[in-house]
Curated annotation (Swiss-Prot):
Taxonomic source organism: Rickettsia africae (strain ESF-5)
Protein name: Phosphatidylglycerol--prolipoprotein diacylglyceryl transferase
Alphabetical list of InterPro entries matching this protein: Lgt (IPR001640)
Recorded GO MF terms: phosphatidylglycerol-prolipoprotein diacylglyceryl transferase activity
Cellular component per GO, a single term: plasma membrane
Key word Cell membrane present: yes
Membrane topology: Multi-pass membrane protein
Subcellular location: Cell inner membrane
């Protein structure tokens, strides 16, 4: 397969460069906001549209700060400790989903505590929305030619310009499909067909469970970060960080269905 050599920068105005990566965040937040509003209109949960509007600022800060710090601390600390100013260069890529998730969870908790809102009621609304951002983010990773997969002889192999010119799995597209489209479809089905918002924590549990499963599986095809490599000879950082999400998801599902 041929890599579509797309310029990561959409356009520049003087020193200001607009990248596909940055645009993916903006579009993801706007589409997510729209979709969450539709869910609120349909099911009239405890969370109101005004609550959601107020939460957007918290969410953006939590996701961006958490995602960036997660990448800096977990994936490439030596580079950023040597050149701290590079931490601000988010337009170059380098965001950790696990860090962004933790940042979003912390800001959601602080928001709920301030406005006296049930925490899981909020995360249950957000859970069906997150795959939209995941899909767009992975497509942006693909355009950037980053986070590519392991060497393969299969017909799916693709030569990325920033790699060693060996055919590799386009693992960004695998993640976009499973963590984005498939996970979105699962949560849309459970939310609208099975009315999972009626059981506090269930949507959140479904998200964490399936995201953990998909991420752990797809990491088998993804090249480990060069500065980290394999952990315990065969595991990647992404797999290790996804195990707690998988366990948390199972716990929330069980808690939402007490016997």
């Amino acid at each position: 397969m041929t890599f579509p050599n797309i310029n990561p920068i959409i356009f520049s105005i003087g020193p200001l460069a607009i990248s596909w990566y940055s645009l993916s965040y903006v579009i993801g937040i706007l589409l997510g906001w729209f979709y969450a509003n539709k869910i609120i209109e349909k099911f009239k949960p405890q969370i109101t549209k005004k609550n959601l509007e107020d939460f957007i600022t918290y969410a953006v800060i939590g996701i961006i700060v958490g995602g960036r710090l997660g990448f800096v601390l977990l994936y490439n600390p030596s580079r950023y400790f040597s050149n701290p100013i590079d931490i601000l260069k988010t337009y170059e890529g380098g965001m950790s989903f696990h860090g962004g998730a933790l940042g979003g969870i912390i800001t959601a908790y602080l928001f709920c505590r301030k406005y006296k809102i049930n925490f899981l009621s909020l995360t249950d609304i957000i859970a069906p929305v997150v795959p939209i951002g995941l899909f767009l983010g992975r497509i942006a990773n693909f355009i950037n030619g980053e986070l590519y997969g392991r060497i393969t002889n299969s017909s799916f192999g693709m030569i990325f310009p920033n790699s060693d010119l060996m055919p590799r799995h386009p693992s960004q597209l695998y993640e976009a499909f499973f963590e984005g489209l498939v996970l979105f479809s699962i949560l849309a089905y459970t939310t609208f067909k099975h009315k999972t918002l009626k059981k506090c924590g269930l949507n959140s549990g479904i998200f964490f469970t399936f995201y953990g499963l998909f991420r752990i599986t797809i990491e088998i095809f993804r090249e480990p970060d060069i500065q980290i490599g394999f952990i315990l000879d065969s595991l990647t950082m992404g797999q290790i960080l996804s195990v707690p999400m998988l366990l948390l998801g199972g716990y929330l599902i069980c808690q939402s269905n007490p016997k």
